[in-house]
Amino acid sequence: MGRGKIEIKRIENANNRVVTFSKRRNGLVKKAKEITVLCDAKVALIIFASNGKMIDYCCPSMDLGAMLDQYQKLSGKKLWDAKHENLSNEIDRIKKENDSLQLELRHLKGEDIQSLNLKNLMAVEHAIEHGLDKVRDHQMEILISKRRNEKMMAEEQRQLTFQLQQQEMAIASNARGMMMRDHDGQFGYRVQPIQPNLQEKIMSLVID
C-alpha cells in the first residue's frame, strides 16, 4: 500500500515549522551543489526564512551579481531601476578610470613601457619633466621658508639675549645701590656714640 499524498500547507506548530525549514533548506542547497557539479550548470539559490534570515548559494564559477545581470539580460526583466543602472555605470566608469590611472602611474615609474610607441614615450617623458619641475619648485619654497624661519629664530634669540643682559645689569645695579646704603648706615651708627664726648669736651674748653 503506497503512502498517501501529503497535503502541502503551512505548518501551524512553530517548532515543527523550524525543523522542517531546516531540513528542506539543507536539501535544496545540497541539490543545488549537486546539479552544479554533475551538469556543469550555473546555479544560484536565495532563501529568506520567516524571521528574515537569508540563506544563499551560488556556484563557484560565477558570483551572484554576475548571475543576476545575466538573468536580467536573457529574460528582459529589469531587476534594477534607472537609478541603480546609472550607479552601476558610474562604478564601471570609475573602475576603468582607476585602471587607466594605475597604468599611467606604472609608466611614470618606468614600468610596463615596452608596449608604448614613440609618441606615448615622449608624453611620459614630458610628464616626468613637468613633475620634476614642480618638485624642484616646491623644494625651493621649503628651503626659502626654512631659511626665513631660521632668520626669525636667530633674531628672537638676539632679542632675548639683549633683554637678559639688560635684566642682569639692572640686578647688578640694584645690588650695588643696596650695598652702598648698607655701608652708609653702618658708618653713621659708629659715629653716633662719639658725638656726646665731643660735645662734652667742647663745653669744658668753653668753661675753662
Swiss-Prot record:
UniProt domain K-box: residue ranges: 84-170
Keyword Phosphoprotein: no
InterPro entries, alphabetized: MADS-box/MEF2_TF (IPR050142), MEF2-like_N (IPR033896), TF_Kbox (IPR002487), TF_MADSbox (IPR002100), TF_MADSbox_sf (IPR036879)
Cellular localisation: Nucleus
Key word Transcription present: yes
Induction of the gene: Positively regulated by the meristem identity proteins APETALA1 and LEAFY with the cooperation of UFO. Repressed by silencing mediated by polycomb group (PcG) protein complex containing EMF1 and EMF2.
GO CC field: cytoplasm; nucleus
GO molecular function: DNA binding; DNA-binding transcription factor activity; protein dimerization activity; RNA polymerase II transcription regulatory region sequence-specific DNA binding; transcription cis-regulatory region binding
Effect of N51D: In strain: cv. Lisse
UniProt miscellaneous comment: Mutations in PI cause transformation of petals into sepals and stamina into carpels.
Protein name per UniProt: Floral homeotic protein PISTILLATA
